[in-house]
Amino acid sequence: MMGPPPGMFPGDKNKNAIPKPKSVKEIPSYLKTLLSGFFGRLFYIFGIVWNTAPWIMIAMSAIALVQGLLPIVSLHVSSAVLNALQSAYSMAQQGAPIEGFLKILPWKAIVAIVEGNTDAVLLASLVLSFVLLTFVIRVISNVVNLLQNAVTRIGGELVVRQVKVMIMEKAKVLDLASFDLPEFYEKLENANREAGHRPIQILSSTFSVITTVIQLIAYVVTLVTIPKMWAAALVIMVLAIPTAIVNFYYRRKNFEYIRRRSKDRRQMNYYSDLMVNKDLVKEVRMFHLSDTFIDRYQSTFDKYFAGLRKLIWRENIGYLIINVITNCAYLFFFAIIAYNVFAGQMMIGDYSLYTNSLMSVSSCIAALISISASIYEGTLFIDNLIAFINEKQTVVPVLPEPSEQCPAPAPAKVNHGTAHTIVFEHVSFCYPGSTRRVLDDISVTIRPGETLVLVGLNGAGKTTLIKLLTRLYDPTEGRILLDGRDLREYDVEDLYKMFGIIFQDFGKYAVSVSENIAFGDIYLDADPEKIREAATQSNADDFINKLPNGYDTALMRYFEQDGIELSIGQWQKLAIARAFYSESDVLILDEPTASLDPIAEQEIFNQFDRLRADKTTIFVSHRLSSATVATKILVMEYGRVIEEGDHRTLMNKKGRYHELFTTQAKRYLAEHEGENAPEFPPHPQHPPRFTTKNPE
């Protein structure tokens, strides 16, 4: 479910955001747009709740109606009790008998009094009837409140699930490039933060407004039945206008302040998380960083809190001034009603009815202002969710123009189960927000069944090239062809099935061992034998068999108290097992053995060489011993391919590959013999390449 377009609402951080009015003439247009934005957000939330479970909306509507009517009914009944009690008491004081009133049925007493029979016995019976009715109303009110609590809590959990799923579904299809931008993380953090409570809170508040409006109308109708009391209701409502202005003004100020200081909040969360992150706690303790992070948290909080405190004080001073004026008005009108009682123009029950109605009008207006302002503030925060849901996805299939032969073109499908030809044609790439070319004019052909090894120092662009091949990014310039067709023309999800990949920062999942391996190909039914075979091929079987529950052992302690924490080398073997488990056409391994010793690494590479069959295999590795099994080696420097060929060809060429290989060989020997290992030298002929604009 998509939200309104970005920039629809004032306050959006979008170039299309609606500007504030610069003159009086622009105010009506601004207010119109403001209201349309407010109701746009509100109906967006209603849509979420309705899609979650329609019964939530229906139940809350019925509850709002009943809660709106019960207080005024209760107030009229209480007034009637007091008036009847006063009349019965007066008649009893004059000697009228009241014995036997318990024998009169309530509805008979009501009928008799309506017909004009007002003896003391009937009045006493009427008092009892109203007391019983008050009890019934109270029971109904309690039941309705319990129902409201149940509906809000149950509905709230369902709505949280719905919004969280919306966020996860959106994150599933968003471009990887989005995750490289701080602005994206701000949207993601804000959306996640508000997802837990804002939608159901706004819905509940909206129905509270409906309840309050019903009550307000009933109280005003009660007041206008008395001459001149309509003026009291009008004055109270007029006095509410300054309260509304202050409330809405500071709600928006609060929202704008929180959004403006979102960086401070992220920093506070970051520093507090550092203190409890299980992966960092050892280093934080050993380097005595605890006090540093606590000081930075407190310093950031002080900056954040200083502005927030000023807003809170200013808001409450405004409320104080308005409340003093409003209470003076109450005092005046209460005195008028009391005078009418002393003058015999009203009964005691009438005093209770009208003073409570007057107070209730004020309370309803205050509640309307407060709840409406809360809804307004909540809908502003919902902008965070809308902005995230509206995040543009650019990695989508590029379809040809419709034609008579193909009026509705569909994305191309990959021919799975075969070897593929992959061609990079003058591919260049810059990360979003940067002008530096991470890849610069790459032209390479990967033939079916080849074993390709990418070598080069850190920052050469090896991993970025893999991300473009798997279409996690699209090239800034040039194109990539798969079997003669532009990679962008393929269905993205179908394309992903073609690759079995281990990233350098591979996943460590808090599930069982077997699930960690089976995640390598979720389209296959989990096969215990195939899982064991993959673990054996990655040399993970040895340590798995020693675990308490073998392949069913829970890993990590996020959810299970007895979860097992593996070493980084063991995790890497599980990641490699995932690649062996996959039935993908192209295997890609980005530094797959970085945490393994050279002997274990060579065993893994030999396994891949034996088991890959006719699959195309691409390795990224710093250890050049793996390159000896390759049919093609690409040597990369600063985003360019500077050498290409097999191991023998490149060694005979005595270029950069020869230099890196021999340096690494000497390093291994030096480490073995206990000498100082030589460093990899930078290549003097290939300095960093930048574009002419804004070099980084």
Locations of regions flagged by a protein language model:
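ABC-type nucleotide-binding domain
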Residues: S403-E696
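Cytosolic ends of transmembrane helices, especially the final helix of ABC transmembrane type-1 domains
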Residues: L289, W313, F333, Y354, ...
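Short intracellular "coupling" helices and adjacent cytoplasmic loop segments at the cytosolic face
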Residues: P21-Y30, M166-H197, R261-R296, A387-E401, ...
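An intracellular "coupling" helix at the cytosolic face of ABC transporter transmembrane type-1 domains
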Residues: N51, N190-I202, E256, R260-K263, ...
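Membrane-integrated ABC transporters
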Residues: M1-P71, A88-S129, Q148-T152, E169, ...
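Transmembrane helix-loop-helix hairpins at lipid-water interfaces of multipass membrane proteins
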Residues: M57-L147, L216-R251, C328-A335, Y339-G349, ...
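Cytoplasmic coupling helices
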Residues: A150-E169, L176, V235-D279, D295, ...
